[in-house]
Amino acid sequence: MNIHEYQAKELLRDYGVPVPRGQVIYDVRDAQRAAWHIESDIAVVKAQIHAGGRGKAGGVKIAKSITEVEQFSRELLGKTLVTHQTGQEGRVVKAILIEEGCEIYKEYYIAFTLDRENSKIALIASEEGGMDIEEVAANRPDKILKEIIDPLIGLTDFQGRRVCFNLNIDGSLINDTVELMKNLYRCFIEKDCSLLEINPLVITKNNRVMALDAKINFDGNGLYRNEDVLKLRDLNEEDEKEIEASKYNLSYISLDGNIGCMVNGAGLAMATMDIIKLYGGNPANFLDVGGGASEEKVMNAFKIILSDPKVKGIFVNIFGGIMKCDVIAKGIVNAANEVKLNVPLVVRLEGTNVELGKEILNQSNLNIVTATTMADGAKKIVKLIK
């Protein structure tokens, strides 16, 4: 689950992390009041959407007067902001964060994330903070520092100091910076984060350490024990199909392609998307119905796939273990009849009750193409939609 920048900063403030004073507004008529409230000669007007790259897309503006604060707020509110993370459709700006400006002496990048190679949390840092951090990571990986954190000990002072030394942070600010890192780590652990990113972390010209921007993602599996975090969820920023899928405990992620996929098991789902790409197609989604899905769950999964107007064909790839092939077949047939299937459908079934499942499909009178292998299915669906 993602949250907005202003929400992330409110959370970090509770953990003792220095952040700029700011006010969030939803109506341009509140812009002047917010500007007066932060009591700053320079204000930063920032579009609030669940995507990075706002600065390069014109979603962050520096205002030198209250008049400019109102002007920039009017320009941004209601605007569709397109960044490299939003896709071509972009995101509509429905909230603005107006916060105090500060004179920046130096920018850094600090983040906590899961290091899957080591199965531990990693502190990632760079002296090259700011809008171009992704280019730095791609072209100058030697500028990226990593500290692996022992979960039994947590982030230690010596690790924090080592990062500070490697970032060339002034000695007078090392204690403050280490304390900030430890507070970020505490938030990461206690709130079940999957990513906590500060970009940039800045040293101001009056020698303060401050988190100027913040991005936090949460592990959805931990939300049950963080109800305060769950309350921050903004459904307007989420894909409608993903919201619908979450109601039925389906793992669904929208993609940019035109071949809908329904698979059981995350590994098989990723392999299915890969093989579709291999044969020249583009998957429209990741969809894992799970190991013990009911007929109703399968039917709802099928409906969600078909609700995507980009979908020109569907590939169902099921290996029945706990999941029975006849249950999948019944769900597909019922959903196809209900929504009046009008796109090509390729089904590959293997495993428990496979013959019964195939019989159900054959007797359905639907235009279903069967496949013997995953590769066979991928080839057929790619050919059918061209």
Swiss-Prot record:
Pathway annotation: Carbohydrate metabolism; tricarboxylic acid cycle; succinate from succinyl-CoA (ligase route): step 1/1
Binding of substrate, residues: N264, G321, I322, M323
One annotated Gene Ontology cellular component of this protein: cytosol
UniProt-listed Gene3D superfamilies: ATP-grasp fold, A domain, ATP-grasp fold, B domain, Succinyl-CoA synthetase domains
Reactions catalysed, as given in the entry: succinate + ATP + CoA = succinyl-CoA + ADP + phosphate; GTP + succinate + CoA = succinyl-CoA + GDP + phosphate
Residues noted as binding ATP in the record, renumbered to the chain: K46, G53, R54, G55, E99, C102, E107
Molecular function in Gene Ontology: ATP binding; magnesium ion binding; succinate-CoA ligase (ADP-forming) activity; succinate-CoA ligase (GDP-forming) activity
Matching InterPro entries: ATP-grasp, ATP-grasp_succ-CoA_synth-type, ATP_grasp_subdomain_1, Succ-CoA_synthase_bsu_CS, SUCC_ACL_C, Succ_CoA_ligase-like_bsu, Succinyl-CoA_synth-like
Binding residue positions for Mg(2+): N199, D213
EC number: 6.2.1.5
Organism domain of life: Bacteria
Assembly and binders: Heterotetramer of two alpha and two beta subunits.
Family label: Belongs to the succinate/malate CoA ligase beta subunit family.
Protein's name in the database: Succinate--CoA ligase [ADP-forming] subunit beta
Organism: Alkaliphilus oremlandii (strain OhILAs)
